[in-house]
Amino acid sequence: MSRMAEQQLYIHGGYTSATSGRTFETINPANGNVLATVQAAGREDVDRAVKSAQQGQKIWAAMTAMERSRILRRAVDILRERNDELAKLETLDTGKAYSETSTVDIVTGADVLEYYAGLIPSLEGSQIPLRETSFVYTRREPLGVVAGIGAWNYPIQIALWKSAPALAAGNAMIFKPSEVTPLTALKLAEIYSEAGLPDGVFNVLPGVGAETGQYLTEHPGIAKVSFTGGVASGKKVMANSAASSLKEVTMELGGKSPLIVFDDADLDLAADIAMMANFFSSGQVCTNGTRVFVPAKCKAAFEQKILARVERIRAGDVFDPQTNFGPLVSFPHRDNVLRYIVKGKEEGARVLCGGDVLKGDGLDNGAWVAPTVFTDCSDEMTIVREEIFGPVMSILTYESEEEVIRRANDTDYGLAAGIVTADLNRAHRVIHQLEAGICWINTWGESPAEMPVGGYKHSGIGRENGVMTLQSYTQVKSIQVEMAKFQSIF
């Protein structure tokens, strides 16, 4: 693909040049080619976007629930019509296999938008009787202008997960995509405008997180920030949001999630789940189950089943329908993952497979890392304690249920957890003791629109998806009505 035209900001229904004068490049990690130069939003651009959003939000919030619902449903239709086009762009920018982006990224994002479009008329207040002459009623009102700050692993899906409930509740959103993968969020802005969203209700500001993101979190005109990313960055976002104007925040942060295989489990099922929990999207999924706990007596058999499945991984041309494994999103990220792999070897973990870059067959110029499985791991190892965000699985053994629950919870993270067992009593007993916000029994990874997702501990604050997220983009106003004559004590 030839280099794209320079990408601008999207403010008030159209493209506009950044005032900062700064740019950055976005690359295709499959081959290292530059896809486009992208303009970076500065402080003045954030001010412009907020003013635009304030204007648009008043128009949007004044529409009826059904009018807003119809516009968002039109956007859903356009997303589905353009699925292939958007998936190809997402593959170029992220490196993910087209077999994945064409069936997951836009599809699941559109589902979430459709879900919230349908929920708009359900945003209702309540009536509370006090006595014969007085009652209270409540209104759910939009927050106003909110900000979304996205991560690089699911660019358009995250933009939809954040914008759908915000817009459904009558807010305007300013969205900052990751500087690593900024392209499809700009296309989403075009689609919203085409669907009839008033100008300013969805503005997109590409830029560097430490600058553009910070300006958004500090801006007094923004009522809430929804952030997806790492724990350290999340803490900065939260601190800035609180220090500036006590903004509400939603944080979807990192994870080091446990997958527990019990001795009664079907090991073929367990191996299939472990593969998806570690190597889907080349391991760049925040909910990955990278700490795989297996009974000591099952370890050898489980390892053989994992090795057999690693042989089915097909890396190569990311647009080949048979490819199911792509490069990492960038060269700096690849190098960071490789440092973790070296650390795992140094600390005594045994490499079962992988452990290096992938080369040959057109892969030499890309950010490729081989699917890597470590075994003979222990809880104190760096690769077991820290989030790697790459195709690296750690196999650990255990002896008892009590032991594995304790060790599974021995982490600062609490995003996800899963178990594989044939015993439903055990399944529920154990899941109820795991300190994680998203849990799976005999499956892994699905996050449907109806399911609230978010973390415990350092893995986040608040939830995305589900009814409660729509409500979190509103504020409740209570109004008392008195029909009798008011009595003053003065």
From Swiss-Prot:
Q: One Pfam match, by short name? A: Aldedh
Binding positions for K(+) 2 per the UniProt entry:
L246, K457, G460
- UniProt record, GO biological process: glycine betaine biosynthetic process from choline
Q: Which InterPro entries match?
A: Ald_DH/histidinol_DH (IPR016161), Ald_DH_C (IPR016163), Ald_DH_CS_CYS (IPR016160), Ald_DH_CS_GLU (IPR029510), Ald_DH_N (IPR016162), Aldehyde_DH_dom (IPR015590), BADH (IPR011264)
Q: Which superkingdom? A: Bacteria
Outline what the protein does.
Involved in the biosynthesis of the osmoprotectant glycine betaine. Catalyzes the irreversible oxidation of betaine aldehyde to the corresponding acid.
Q: What is this protein called?
A: Betaine aldehyde dehydrogenase
Source organism of this protein record: Escherichia coli O139:H28 (strain E24377A / ETEC)
